[in-house]
Amino acid sequence: MTTRLGPALVLGVALCLGCGQPLPQVPERPFSVLWNVPSAHCKSRFGVHLPLNALGIIANRGQHFHGQNMTIFYKNQLGLYPYFGPKGTAHNGGIPQALPLDRHLALAAYQIHHSLRPGFAGPAVLDWEEWCPLWAGNWGRRRAYQAASWAWAQQVFPDLDPQEQLYKAYTGFEQAARALMEDTLRVAQALRPHGLWGFYHYPACGNGWHSMASNYTGRCHAATLARNTQLHWLWAASSALFPSIYLPPRLPPAHHQAFVRHRLEEAFRVALVGHLPVLAYVRLTHRRSGRFLSQDDLVQTIGVSAALGAAGVVLWGDLSLSSSEEECWHLHDYLVDTLGPYGINVTRAAMACSHQRCHGHGRCARRDPGQMEAFLHLWPDGSLGDWKSFSCHCYWGWAGPTCQEPRLGPKEAV
């Protein structure tokens, strides 16, 4: 179906969404599209205005990467994250056991206090990808953290035999990694309690594409599922989940929906620990080729996210998208012609379904997640569907099949 909308409808939807305003309501609105692209240079350097507000896309003032509607902290931007550089150089001790945690938390608190207003209520994403907090998750190039932990144990416990030293390395790493991640989230939430705090790419799924796999199902790897269950403490400490649904470069389009669906279903599974909103990260361009996502790619990422009941998506891109006037115009045209109209269609359909089926107190989600043709889309003439394939996931404070009953106490769903 076509999703192109007229200018009047675009403006009307933008006004009803309250675009560009602070967002304490993100967990309690049917679907949000957020902008995490450093596109400020398009306007300030090249005079190219990107009409994000008019397209219903939530962005920071001035379209800056960090701001009061959403922010992301990379490894060198919050506290003293320990990691090894490309040449093996240890930063902040290299491993969690070697980090002075109190110094890290003090610096993180200072940075949060000075970068986010007290009323901050948007997504706040920590992008720490160098190591996994579980020992078994550090394979491939991450084995360096196991080796460094063993060397640490040999130095700290020289009188133990090698097997006991290995045990100290394993337990010491996991305990320190947990303390680092948990305590960072606790400090952040104490300072900015309305923010949606969580780690990018968590939970993982392990359903990446391998070209030799002829029977690809999209299901998450069993070992990854087991590790996610072990990470119950991380979900309990988070206030939102930010899984990645970046499309793998060589994944055939026929498998896109299965890839995205299973990643989101795993996020919904672990989200039950704290009834957390799920905001999926979508990359605007294909890795390697740099091509913008096609209309069908948007359906299989943004559209599937909305249909499964995600709270929204975070659109991500790098500085190359605003590196020249030409690149800014390419981004502008893509926004106006493709991304913006589709985002408006899905956002408005999700809002209408919420009011039609859930009394405006919940979001619609597929009854059967595998029903691949069920989407929250408007018809080409802008009319609404009946959405019989969808049921309600109620917001905090509401219950019942159509979220019609006020409810006090713990969150029923988000």
Curated annotation (Swiss-Prot):
Limits of the EGF-like domain: 349-404
Example of a GO cellular component annotation carried by this entry: endoplasmic reticulum
Signal sequence, start to end: 1-20
Superkingdom of the organism of origin: Eukaryota
Cystine residue pairs: C42-C328, C205-C220, C353-C364, C358-C392, C394-C403
Predominant localisation class: secreted
EC number assigned by the record: 3.2.1.35
Top-level EC class as recorded in UniProt: hydrolase
Listed GO MF terms: hyalurononglucosaminidase activity
Modifications after synthesis and translation: N-glycosylated.
A biological process from GO: hyaluronan catabolic process
Keywords recorded for this protein, A-Z: Cell membrane, Cytoplasmic vesicle, Disulfide bond, EGF-like domain, Endoplasmic reticulum, Endosome, Fertilization, Glycoprotein, Glycosidase, Hydrolase, Membrane, Secreted, Signal
Alphabetized PANTHER family for the sequence: HYALURONIDASE, HYALURONIDASE-3
Function: Facilitates sperm penetration into the layer of cumulus cells surrounding the egg by digesting hyaluronic acid. Involved in induction of the acrosome reaction in the sperm. Involved in follicular atresia, the breakdown of immature ovarian follicles that are not selected to ovulate. Induces ovarian granulosa cell apoptosis, possibly via apoptotic signaling pathway involving CASP8 and CASP3 activation, and poly(ADP-ribose) polymerase (PARP) cleavage. Has no hyaluronidase activity in embryonic fibroblasts in vitro. Has no hyaluronidase activity in granulosa cells in vitro.
Protein name as it appears in the record: Hyaluronidase-3
The gene coding this protein: HYAL3
